[in-house]
């Protein structure tokens, strides 16, 4: 049985999937509140930048992976319009349910699907844009997921990965203090769940840095891969094109 990491802990691959599922079942109901608290609302700006870079137009087909509460899905669905096709997907039933309900509450009628990014249930060359926001670091086989994202993207289409990344060195000390002390405290105080937010901090540190992820996307077969550092590298948006 192969080993992988769950935060800083070494676990069996099958065990990681169960542990990650447990984290997101736990945080689903407070997910948006905690995002606002943890990022001081900055996650909205990061997502807005991603939406602008996606440049979704009427009639586009878009796959939103690990879509959670549906922030990106909502904007993509509005941009694609009635002639488009936007899929709200997540591997976690609790997150999918919360996102689906919130989309419906906002008048967004678009399909929601339980979906494993390592085994995407769509044909080759189907989507104009494939996105994953704050989900790749939780996947056991990131290389397989990136290859699947490329497979279902049309020639000329784009794969976009918005994810926590490696902060600039001058920010590192303060960022570590915030991540390992403040985040678990916020999780405990507002969600009664310090452990899930401790995992968040650890999973960010274990995620590939900007250049490593760029190389992984290239190895998955994507071309013209580039990235933008946001908020001093706290987050990076990677983009790759399928030729």
From Swiss-Prot:
Residues that coordinate or bind S-adenosyl-L-methionine: 69, 90, 116-117
Entry keywords, A to Z: Menaquinone biosynthesis, Methyltransferase, S-adenosyl-L-methionine, Transferase, Ubiquinone biosynthesis
Function recorded in the entry: Methyltransferase required for the conversion of demethylmenaquinol (DMKH2) to menaquinol (MKH2) and the conversion of 2-polyprenyl-6-methoxy-1,4-benzoquinol (DDMQH2) to 2-polyprenyl-3-methyl-6-methoxy-1,4-benzoquinol (DMQH2).
Pathway: Quinol/quinone metabolism; menaquinone biosynthesis; menaquinol from 1,4-dihydroxy-2-naphthoate: step 2/2; Cofactor biosynthesis; ubiquinone biosynthesis
GO molecular function: 2-methoxy-6-polyprenyl-1,4-benzoquinol methyltransferase activity; demethylmenaquinone methyltransferase activity
PANTHER family per UniProt: 2-METHOXY-6-POLYPRENYL-1,4-BENZOQUINOL METHYLASE, MITOCHONDRIAL (PTHR43591:SF24), METHYLTRANSFERASE (PTHR43591)
Keyword NAD carried by entry: no
Enzyme nomenclature, EC number: 2.1.1.163, 2.1.1.201
Protein name: Ubiquinone/menaquinone biosynthesis C-methyltransferase UbiE
Family matches, as NCBIfam families: MenG_MenH_UbiE, PRK00216.1-1
Pfam families attached to this UniProt entry: Ubie_methyltran
Similarity field: Belongs to the class I-like SAM-binding methyltransferase superfamily. MenG/UbiE family.
Catalysed conversion reaction: a 2-demethylmenaquinol + S-adenosyl-L-methionine = a menaquinol + S-adenosyl-L-homocysteine + H(+); a 2-methoxy-6-(all-trans-polyprenyl)benzene-1,4-diol + S-adenosyl-L-methionine = a 5-methoxy-2-methyl-3-(all-trans-polyprenyl)benzene-1,4-diol + S-adenosyl-L-homocysteine + H(+)
Stored Gene3D superfamilies: Vaccinia Virus protein VP39
Keyword Methyltransferase (UniProt): yes
GO process terms (BP): aerobic respiration; menaquinone biosynthetic process; methylation
Gene: ubiE
């Amino acid at each position: 049985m192969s080993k992988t990491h769950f935060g800083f802990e070494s676990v069996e691959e099958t065990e990681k999937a169960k542990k990650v599922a447990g984290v997101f079942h736990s945080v689903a109901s407070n997910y948006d509140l905690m995002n606002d608290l943890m990022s001081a609302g900055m996650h909205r700006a990061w997502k807005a930048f991603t939406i602008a870079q996606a440049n979704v137009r009427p009639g586009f087909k878009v796959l939103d992976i690990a879509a959670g509460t549906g922030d990106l899905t909502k904007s993509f669905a509005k941009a694609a319009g009635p002639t488009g096709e936007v899929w709200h997907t997540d591997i976690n039933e609790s997150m999918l349910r919360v996102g689906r309900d919130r989309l419906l509450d906002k008048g967004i009628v678009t399909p929601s699907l339980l979906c494993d990014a390592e085994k995407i249930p769509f044909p080759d060359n189907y989507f104009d844009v494939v996105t994953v926001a704050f989900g790749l670091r939780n996947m056991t086989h990131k290389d397989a997921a990136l290859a699947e994202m490329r497979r279902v993207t049309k020639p000329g289409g784009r794969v976009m990965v918005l994810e926590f990344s490696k902060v600039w060195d001058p920010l590192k000390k303060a960022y570590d203090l915030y991540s390992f002390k403040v985040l678990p405290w916020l999780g405990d105080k507002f969600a009664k769940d310090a452990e899930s937010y401790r995992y968040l901090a650890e999973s960010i540190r274990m995620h590939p840095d900007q250049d490593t992820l760029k190389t992984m996307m290239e190895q998955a077969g994507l071309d013209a891969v580039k990235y933008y550092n946001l908020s001093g590298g706290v987050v990076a948006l990677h983009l790759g094109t399928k030729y």
